[in-house]
Amino acid sequence: MIKAIIGKIIGTRNDRWIKQYKKQVLTINALEPTYEKMSDVELQNAFEELKKRVRSTEKNLQEKTLLEVLPESFAITREASKRILKMRHFDVQLIGGMVLNDGKIAEMKTGEGKTLVATLAVALNALKGESVYVVTVNDYLAHRDSKEMEPLYHFLGYSVGTITASVRDDDERLEIYSKDIVYGTNNEFGFDYLRDNMKYSLEHKVQKSHAFAIVDEVDSILIDEARTPLIISGPVDRRMENYNKADEVAKSMQVETDFTIDEKNRTILITEEGIKKAENLFGVDNLYKIENAALSHHLDQALKANYLFFIDKDYIVANNEVVIVDEFTGRLSEGRRFSEGLHQALEAKEGVSIKEESQTLADITFQNYFRMFSKLSGMTGTAQTEATEFLEIYNLEVVSIPTNLAIKRKDLNDLIYKSEKEKFDAVILKIKELHDKGQPVLVGTASIEKSETLHALLKKERIPHTVLNAKQHTKEAEIIKDAGLKGAVTIATNMAGRGVDIKLTDEIKELGGLYIIGTERHESRRIDNQLRGRSGRQGDPGTSQFYLSLEDNLLRIFGSDRIKGVMEKLGLKDGEHIESKLVTRAVENAQKKVENLHFESRKHLLEYDDVANEQRKSVYKFRDELLDINYDISAKIAENREYALNQIFSKLKAFDHQNLSEEELLGLKNVLKEDFNAHVELEDLEKASPIEKFVAEKLKSDYENKMKVLDSEQRSRIERIVYLQILDNAWREHLYTMDNLKTGINLRGYNQKDPLVEYKKESYNLFLEFIEDIKIEAIKTFSKIQFENEQDSSDAERYLDNFSEEREHESVTYRHEETLDEDLNVAMKAFSKTPKRNEPCPCQSGKKYKDCCAKSGPKKGLFAK
């Protein structure tokens, strides 16, 4: 109340921003007569001068220069638009362009020309010479907007590209991203970023920078889709026959002759005879060539499966599946699988079907993808209700832009009925009345199910209508455009048709414009406002009204008792409704509660993803270093060798490594043979002093002797790609482990432990293990690589080229779907303060806390049924 009074006296923060922007508008308008007099060539030359000025400025000062040239850039862009598009930017659109350039969100009502507004900020920021991304919610809008604005951009000397799901060719994508301005969907931009970080050449990466992005329908992308990460997943190993072949080879090998078993350390060491036998059975000349790395790995796992793991002790076979027996509890660990191909090796051993595991190869949330941009801005018709979240999560201020013409739409109070049947009966009557009159009506529903229900009722009444939901998404734009025709009745889910204007004829305006009927309040006020905003564009007349019932989800869970009591006191009969500002306010308060719950939920999930994001950035940075031909990969390998040896010697019992027992020396000899392919005689180890130096020099000389057949360029290339392969495999395994950790961490909340703290702690330890695994695995792999002659090195290069090509084009699945993180949120609620007795139960059953979890504790599966 006090805040509102102060706002009226001195103006709100938004008012002060608009006042500042209006001063700039006067400056831009003053330049209009000058540019109007110029020929097309003169106008283009003037814009080229701005490009030269900005690009000649030092990079860290370019933003300052952009602000200096903003009036000229906006004025030239407006003049060019008048000539090319026959559209002149209004003053309020100039304000919108400045808001976007400042890295804020421009809240502009439907029909205010957001597509044209974007051209001002895009043209200005593209002066720097870095690609500007314009992000939309679907392929149709990306294609439409880019094609409509392309002539303007071409006039200004810019190239334009559009990324859609239909662009499959990598070279074509690379070409599109080389353009000055790139339109595309949020999904395509996000997936391309992930794909870039799976490439084996810097030249193949399509996104060269993340300088500036304008996100259209920013609330939909950064709020509604914030909880659904982009995931690229794929099979762990596509060649399932390798497991069966390796199992055959392992079963044919003899203990002591072909391999030895170290039961104490649960390891197996293949002898020279065993290697020869395996090479013969696999049909290869050298098991440890790069191209045979997968076979040697499968053989290692098959030997472990056959000689170290035993049925009814380590695992059982049930229902054609291998089920792990927990070594500590003796219980079955259903759903768990051994990693690194061991589980598949056991399946091959037992003759059951081998499961091709699908695991996460790369993932990112939109929150973390878009926060990478140096400057980010957005546009939408509805952002103020989520202003706090935009600021806290993305550091984006929301600025409400005044409309060019006053809004004439009438927003009527909600009508509330006792039952859903009564509500729908009233809706059908209203639709029939409007249809008979010829006034177009757009009916918003909360789900496909409800739209189908309404469709059946209208069909029964023989009222012609069109249904728009996920089943007809390909016709979305066409259906929405026709929603303003005389007598049109359109049923749509609340989010349908965003970005498509419903234009009205003068006849329709005389009839009262587009009539909006909402059949249910959404959990978010913003979605309701979007539905209302379909009507009343650019000063058009229109009406909106919501029809509710006590059986609606929102009213059933929040506050329906009070409203129900009012209805009973009034003695309302079937079919009658109540209409009151107090009731409407009660519904909006219920929505605020739900919005706050969702905000806290998204904030918690982001805190979890931030942990993984820091790890992701670190890995991707190192990956880019490896891709750089100037990176000293040999020094990295030497560093890893030193680390691996330190780990080995640190595990030896004797403090003085010069006085190792014969058993320890024998163990060291076996480790050097098994892990590093180093043949060292026992007497040489006994005589060595200091032993660490002897072993280090032995491994180094063995490696350098192997690499002599390669020239420096070949060596660097092979080392970099092999290291990338090791890094990628380890990263995939790490993501798999992190997924498992996240799945189980939610239960800690019921033990009064903060799941987030536990997750941070354990994920950090896992990341340290991941780094250690890379170092150890790298040196093991490089130690086992063999090049006997130049032909071997050429074969290796060809293999690596094919491997890189296959990896970049491997069969993967792209997912952008709801995650199972609801459990996480419920756990957080369990950890946080207990709700009051009469508050809604946090398990979302719709009951009060005292009648639900307060009595019985959280329901099985965390959700009440």
From Swiss-Prot:
Location in the cell: Cell inner membrane; Cytoplasm
Enzymatic class: translocase
Cellular component terms per the entry's GO annotation: cell envelope Sec protein transport complex; cytosol; plasma membrane
Note on how the cofactor is bound: May bind 1 zinc ion per subunit.
Predominant location: membrane
Family matches, as InterPro entries: Helicase_ATP-bd, Helicase_C-like, P-loop_NTPase, SEC_C_motif, SecA, SecA_CS, SecA_DEAD, SecA_motor_DEAD
Keywords from the named record: ATP-binding, Cell inner membrane, Cell membrane, Cytoplasm, Membrane, Metal-binding, Nucleotide-binding, Protein transport, Translocase, Translocation, Transport, Zinc
GO BP terms in the entry: intracellular protein transmembrane transport; protein import; protein targeting; protein transport by the Sec complex
PROSITE patterns per UniProt: SECA, SECA_MOTOR_DEAD
UniProt keyword Cell inner membrane present: yes
One Gene Ontology molecular-function label: metal ion binding
Binding site for Zn(2+): C841, C843, C852, C853
Cofactor names: Zn(2+)
Reactions this protein catalyses: ATP + H2O + cellular proteinSide 1 = ADP + phosphate + cellular proteinSide 2
Membrane topology: Peripheral membrane protein
EC number(s) recorded for this UniProt protein: 7.4.2.8
Binding site for ATP: Q93, G111, E112, G113, K114, T115, D501
Subunit and partners: Monomer and homodimer. Part of the essential Sec protein translocation apparatus which comprises SecA, SecYEG and auxiliary proteins SecDF-YajC and YidC.
Family under the similarity heading: Belongs to the SecA family.
HAMAP family assigned: SecA
Cited function: Part of the Sec protein translocase complex. Interacts with the SecYEG preprotein conducting channel. Has a central role in coupling the hydrolysis of ATP to the transfer of proteins into and across the cell membrane, serving as an ATP-driven molecular motor driving the stepwise translocation of polypeptide chains across the membrane.
NCBIfam families referenced in this protein's UniProt entry, alphabetically: PRK09200.1 (NF006630), secA (TIGR00963)
The protein, known as: Protein translocase subunit SecA
Source species: Helicobacter pylori (strain HPAG1)
Organism lineage: Bacteria, Pseudomonadati, Campylobacterota, Epsilonproteobacteria, Campylobacterales
